[in-house]
Amino acid sequence: FRSGSNQVSEVAWYVGNSSGGQYGEAGTTRPVGLKKSNELGLYDMSGNVWEWCGDLYTKEYKQGGKSIHPGWPFEGTYLFFRRILRGGSWGGTAKGCRVSYIDYDIENYSDEYGGFRLVMEPESIK
């Protein structure tokens, strides 16, 4: 499932609908809001760019008691500091855009497929 629709092309930019056509070929991000929003009115929660999360990835990473991404077989929970990435990107597969899918990388890595989301608390609830 993707955020806002089960049809990936309705809500996400990924390799199947971004210029380039094959993973690794030249393509680009898209302006926010060109696809459907999700149920909360948020855009681009799936696809466009991978979003960095604050969670550290470990090979023991589990969701609901079940391992959801086996990861690399590195030794020691914090041998390498890897952060969780979610959402998929314009250069990745439709599977990577699923809400439940996670990826990870070292925290000082950057490329054209990743980004972050700014979040601000409205004055009315402070």
Language model feature labels by segment:
Residues 4-7, 27-28, 45-126:
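Surface-exposed recognition segments
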Residues 10-42:
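A short, contiguous structural element within a folded domain that forms the immediate neighborhood
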